[in-house]
Amino acid sequence: MIKAMNISYEIGDKLYLNITNKCPCNCTFCIRHNGDGAYGSDPLWLEHQPTAEEGIDNIKKRDLDSYKEIIFCGYGEPTCELEILKETAKYIKSVTKTPIRINTNGLSDLINKRETPAEFKGLVDIISISLNASDAKAYDEITRPSFKGVNCFEEMLSFAKRVKEFVPEVMLTVVDIIGEEEIKKSQAVADSVGIHLRVCLLYTSPS
């Protein structure tokens, strides 16, 4: 495992922010199992947990107006450091109109032990939430969350439904390797909560 302090990294015309390595899940398909970086990036394992100040200093070196999107997504779940995320997003909003997206597992309420959807208001343009499966059993098998005695699938869907009130665009995602039948069932779940489903091609493009 190679560690560095690559808090931001580019893929195509998008800037990704790697603000933490913490994550309460151990997804079977997670790219962290396959190497030190994502889609050709430099190592994303961090030498230490960066502060908001470190993250902001890092992105000040970037031309934020030049990107199509700025995405909180790295080798960890960004809502594990929610205060750092919010402070960083607030700075970004103060200097550019480039849209901000968060790629999340949707377990922010469990992670932070409080209701968090309203905290994203005015700071985030898009939230992409990993649905991963069409029911709780399959979800636990794929996502392998560390929270015990909790229906994480329902917690994730509840977060998705509530955060729609505060963020302009919300989407749910699955990866293509779950198969056509499971994707159809996942589409039905997304339709039931009125949220767009995106199918991501694993290992060919970041979600």
PLM region descriptions:
Residues 2-4, 56-59, 113-117, 158:
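A generic local structural motif
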Residues 203-207:
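Conserved small/polar residues in nucleotide/adenosyl-binding loops
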Residues 33-71, 83:
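Conserved alpha-helical substructure of the radical SAM core
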Residues 4-51:
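Canonical Radical SAM [4Fe-4S] cluster-binding loop centered on the CxxxCxxC motif
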Residues 17, 70-72, 139:
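Generic structural signal for conserved hydrophobic packing positions in ordered secondary structure
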Residues 75-202:
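Conserved AdoMet/S-adenosylmethionine-binding subsite of the radical SAM
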Residues 9-11, 62-65, 121-122:
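Flexible, charged surface loops at secondary-structure boundaries
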